[in-house]
């Protein structure tokens, strides 16, 4: 029998110490990685619940194990809330991650060797959209589209590639693109060549849920997302679709048993909490602020003479090109890290440097907005980043910014009492 008195701190002090150090880092550092956010205590409580003990292969009311009557309730809550949140007719909440959700979509609708048309990783796409190092680029014939000299998707070029290569699936989505996707145009192109339209909205799902970014569900055959990032839930995946019995059956079979075994019901419970939070009015206010904060930061960089890819942002992130300053993304990332500002180095269009070095930074505002930052704080923060980038090698500037970061983090804690 287990005793609830035997806490992790008592049982495994070494592990607990590392976790406490991470908690301290999150409180004392400013998080600007666009794909990161902070979950609520309720989300973490669900994910750390007794549901982790239960195997539940199959789907609600169609399980291969007994004793699933209560996890059926949990999973159905998550399904119903996801459908309500995004206006979908179908939702599969079982994918363990966004990449696995994407893999399931490919398994469901494609055969090995089929052609897919997706956004180039070098231009802001994602590994799973046909990059050569990903299974999506190895199992399928991946054709890539990119952005033009203005940093925008050239839809005429997308259409030309679609007509030329006749893809079975067109993938719309990104990991580093700061503008709004034209889902209606993607739909028209897909229809012209008889392709499925698959939208990966992992980065903007929270904005979509709040009505701050267009909803792809009415246009796409299938939509996937992660449940963290802007959605502010646990790490996991989600598949959505409009009513289509044939596609729904294929998607369910692709997730289980093709791609996964038993679902993680404790994570699904946390997803259900996240979806409930996203249905509240305050979530819309939060997402509106995420966008305002990103735009405020981007403008500071422009005013200070830095290059922002595509000239600004219409979502939660933007790419800062440091080619003109002859600063590598790797060095900028490290310098900011010493100032307790966490970003990620990122390739920029036509980057002359390798993906391990890069010439840019990707900056996002979901996490700082969760802390309570508004435009004033974000403008100040962007100014501190500029100070460091304009004085690379001057550790006194880094030291000064670090003290300012610690002070503002104390003023805006992630988890209050």
From Swiss-Prot:
Which InterPro entries does the record match to this protein?
PyrdxlP-dep_Trfase (IPR015424), PyrdxlP-dep_Trfase_major (IPR015421), PyrdxlP-dep_Trfase_small (IPR015422), Ser_HO-MeTrfase (IPR001085), Ser_HO-MeTrfase-like (IPR049943), Ser_HO-MeTrfase_PLP_BS (IPR019798), SHMT-like_dom (IPR039429)
Q: What residues bind (6S)-5,6,7,8-tetrahydrofolate, as annotated?
A: 121, 125-127, 354-356
- Catalytic activity of the protein: (6R)-5,10-methylene-5,6,7,8-tetrahydrofolate + glycine + H2O = (6S)-5,6,7,8-tetrahydrofolate + L-serine
User: Which keywords appear in this protein's UniProt record, sorted alphabetically?
Assistant: Amino-acid biosynthesis, Cytoplasm, One-carbon metabolism, Pyridoxal phosphate, Transferase
Required co-factors: pyridoxal 5'-phosphate
Taxonomy, superkingdom: Bacteria
User: What transmembrane ranges does the database entry give?
Assistant: none
Q: Output the Gene Ontology terms for molecular function.
A: glycine hydroxymethyltransferase activity; pyridoxal phosphate binding
Answer whether the UniProt record assigns the keyword Transmembrane to this protein: no
According to the UniProt entry, what is the EC number of this protein? 2.1.2.1
Q: List the record's Gene Ontology CC terms alphabetically.
A: cytoplasm; cytosol
Q: Which residues carry this modification: N6-(pyridoxal phosphate)lysine?
A: 229
Q: Where is this site: Plays an important role in substrate specificity?
A: 228
Q: Which SUPFAM superfamilies match?
A: PLP-dependent transferases
Q: In which pathway does it act?
A: One-carbon metabolism; tetrahydrofolate interconversion; Amino-acid biosynthesis; glycine biosynthesis; glycine from L-serine: step 1/1
Q: Name one GO biological process term.
A: tetrahydrofolate metabolic process
Compartments, as annotated in UniProt: Cytoplasm
State the family it belongs to.
Answer: Belongs to the SHMT family.
* Summary of subunit composition and partner proteins: Homodimer.
What is this protein's function?
Catalyzes the reversible interconversion of serine and glycine with tetrahydrofolate (THF) serving as the one-carbon carrier. This reaction serves as the major source of one-carbon groups required for the biosynthesis of purines, thymidylate, methionine, and other important biomolecules. Also exhibits THF-independent aldolase activity toward beta-hydroxyamino acids, producing glycine and aldehydes, via a retro-aldol mechanism.
What protein is this chain from?
Serine hydroxymethyltransferase 3
User: What gene name does this entry carry?
Assistant: glyA3
């Amino acid at each position: 029998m287990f005793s609830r008195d035997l806490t992790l701190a008592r049982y495994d002090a070494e592990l607990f110490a590392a976790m406490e150090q991470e908690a301290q880092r999150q409180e004392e550092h400013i998080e600007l990685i666009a794909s990161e956010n902070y979950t609520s205590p309720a989300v973490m409580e669900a994910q750390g619940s007794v549901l982790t003990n239960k195997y539940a292969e199959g789907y609600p009311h169609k399980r291969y194990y007994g004793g699933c009557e209560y996890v059926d309730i949990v999973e159905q809550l998550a399904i119903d809330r996801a459908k309500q949140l995004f206006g979908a007719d179908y939702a599969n909440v079982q994918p363990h991650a966004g990449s696995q959700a994407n893999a399931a979509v490919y398994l469901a609708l494609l055969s090995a060797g089929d052609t897919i048309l997706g956004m180039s990783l070098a231009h802001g796409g994602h590994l799973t959209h046909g990059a050569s190092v990903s299974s999506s680029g190895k199992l399928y014939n991946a054709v890539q589209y990119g952005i033009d000299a203005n940093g925008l998707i050239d839809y005429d070029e997308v259409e030309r590639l679609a007509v030329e290569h006749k893809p079975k699936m067109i993938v719309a989505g990104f990991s580093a693109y700061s503008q709004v996707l034209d889902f209606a145009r993607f739909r028209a192109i897909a229809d012209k060549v008889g392709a499925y339209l698959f939208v990966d909205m992992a980065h903007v799902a929270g904005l979509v849920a709040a009505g701050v970014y267009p909803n792809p569900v009415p246009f796409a055959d299938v939509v996937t997302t992660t449940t963290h990032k802007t959605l502010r839930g646990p790490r996991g995946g989600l598949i959505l679709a409009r009513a289509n019995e044939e596609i729904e059956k294929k998607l369910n079979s692709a997730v289980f048993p093709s791609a996964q075994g038993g679902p993680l019901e404790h994570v699904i419970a946390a997803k259900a909490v996240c979806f409930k939070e996203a249905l509240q009015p305050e979530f819309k206010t939060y997402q509106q602020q995420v966008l305002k904060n990103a735009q405020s930061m981007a403008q500071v960089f422009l005013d200070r003479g830095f290059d922002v890819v595509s000239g600004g942002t219409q979502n939660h992130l933007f790419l800062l090109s440091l080619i003109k300053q002859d600063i590598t993304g790797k060095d900028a990332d490290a310098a900011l890290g010493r100032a307790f500002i966490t970003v990620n180095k990122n390739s920029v269009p036509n980057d002359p440097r390798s993906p391990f070095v890069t010439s840019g930074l990707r900056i996002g505002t979901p996490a700082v907005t969760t802390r309570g930052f508004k435009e004033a704080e974000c403008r100040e923060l962007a100014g501190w980043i500029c100070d460091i980038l304009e004085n690379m090698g001057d550790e006194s500037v880094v030291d000064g910014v670090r003290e300012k970061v610690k002070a503002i983090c104390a003023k805006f804690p992630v988890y209050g009492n």
